[in-house]
């Protein structure tokens, strides 16, 4: 009705992780409407135990994004809604960089990890989108190589202080092909 193409949600909603049954109708409606969902970290876990060095923003935010991705995957949200368009801000946080560990845990302890979804978590990399703001050219290259150039889009984190000061500089620094940049 409003012509909006998508919405932004936090990495969790209050005390609910993104696999909470109370949130499924929201994700289902977004999927049916073809609306995109940007997941941005907030209210970082462990904040009380990290009072110094801006640690909630430096290490808590990446962990929040991994938490969100794992809940969407392990909770079966992405399995039940294969057309759901989800983009994880900050390059997916630590999720793409720990997918090997996550997959290993899935394979070694399915009794704990695969309780609500028996599908390998790595399979969902092709279903998720990631923004490009990772603050490191090598990390961006890894993200592109791991998730695919068609799954990574420009991200700046504007207007927050950790955002990319020159939008697109990270992508431009990689000397990607014109086709990859266009994606």
Model-derived features with residue positions:
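Distinct, well-ordered alpha-helical segments
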Residues: 1, 19-23, 99-103, 139-144
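Active-site gating/metal-coordination segments in enzymes
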Residues: 1-76
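Short, well-ordered coil/turn segments that N-cap beta-strands
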Residues: 2-7, 33-35, 82-85, 121-128, ...
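A cross-domain feature marking catalytic cores of carbohydrate-active enzymes
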Residues: 6-13, 39-41, 88-90, 132-134, ...
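Active-site environment of divalent metal-dependent phosphoester hydrolases
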Residues: 14-15, 43-49, 81, 93-97, ...
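Aromatic-lined glycan-binding groove of carbohydrate-active enzymes
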Residues: 76, 82-123
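Mid-to-C-terminal alpha-helical segments outside catalytic/metal-binding sites
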Residues: 84, 94, 129-130, 134-153, ...
